[in-house]
Curated annotation (Swiss-Prot):
It holds the Pfam family Reticulon. The chain crosses the membrane at residues 30-50, 117-137. One of its GO terms (cellular component) is endoplasmic reticulum membrane. PANTHER family: RETICULON-LIKE PROTEIN B22, RETICULON-LIKE PROTEIN B23. This is Reticulon-like protein B23. Residues 1-155 form the Reticulon domain. The keyword Plastid does not apply. InterPro entries: Reticulon, RTNLB22/23. It is found in: Endoplasmic reticulum membrane. It comes from the Eukaryota.
Length: 155
C-alpha cells in the first residue's frame, strides 16, 4: 500500500473515531468496546455460517501471531518517542536552554487556551487531518517528480 493509501485509510479511520467520540459524546473506551463487540459478533456469525455450509476455514485465527522482533520493534519505537518527549521537557524544565523553555511554554499555553475553546477530540482530529494532508501532498509531489524523470508530460 502506498503512502497515499495509508493517508486515506488513516483519514477514514480517524473520521470514524471522531464521529464516535465527538458527535455521539462517547468515550474511547466505549469505542474499543463497540469494535470488539462487532468483531466478536461477526466472527461468531461467520463461524456458524461456515459450519452450516460445511466450509473449512483455511487459517485458524488463534494461530495468528506476531514475531518477537516485531513486538520488540513496536515497544522500542514507543519507548524512543516517550523518551524523546521526556528529554525535551526535562531540558526545558531545567532552564538550561532558554529558547526551548520559551517554545515549550508558548506551545503549552496555546494548547491550554485551545483546549478551553475546542474539545480535545476535535483538536486531535484536526491534527490527524493536517497530518494526512501533508502525507498526500508529499506523495503527489513525489509522483510528479518521478513522472518528470520518466519523461512523461503532465497536463
Amino acid at each position: 500500500m502506498g503512502e497515499m493509501g495509508k493517508a486515506i485509510g488513516l483519514l477514514i479511520s480517524g473520521t470514524l473515531v471522531y464521529h464516535h467520540c465527538a458527535n455521539r459524546n462517547a468515550t474511547l473506551l466505549s469505542l474499543i468496546s463497540d469494535v470488539l463487540i462487532v468483531l466478536l459478533s461477526s466472527l461468531a456469525i461467520l463461524g456458524l455460517l461456515f459450519r452450516h455450509l460445511n466450509v473449512s476455514v483455511p487459517v485458524d485465527p488463534l494461530e495468528w501471531q506476531i514475531s518477537q522482533d516485531t513486538a520488540c520493534n513496536i515497544v522500542a519505537r514507543l519507548a524512543n518517542t516517550v523518551g524523546a518527549a521526556e528529554s525535551v521537557l526535562r531540558v526545558a524544565a531545567t532552564g538550561h536552554d532558554k529558547r526551548l523553555f520559551v517554545k515549550v511554554v508558548i506551545c503549552l499555553y496555546f494548547l491550554a487556551a485551545l483546549g478551553r475553546i475546542i474539545s480535545g477530540v476535535t483538536i486531535a482530529y484536526a491534527g490527524l487531518c493536517l497530518f494526512c494532508l501533508s502525507m498526500l501532498f508529499r506523495s503527489s509531489i513525489r509522483n510528479s517528480v518521478l513522472n518528470r524523470r520518466n519523461g512523461e508530460i503532465l497536463d
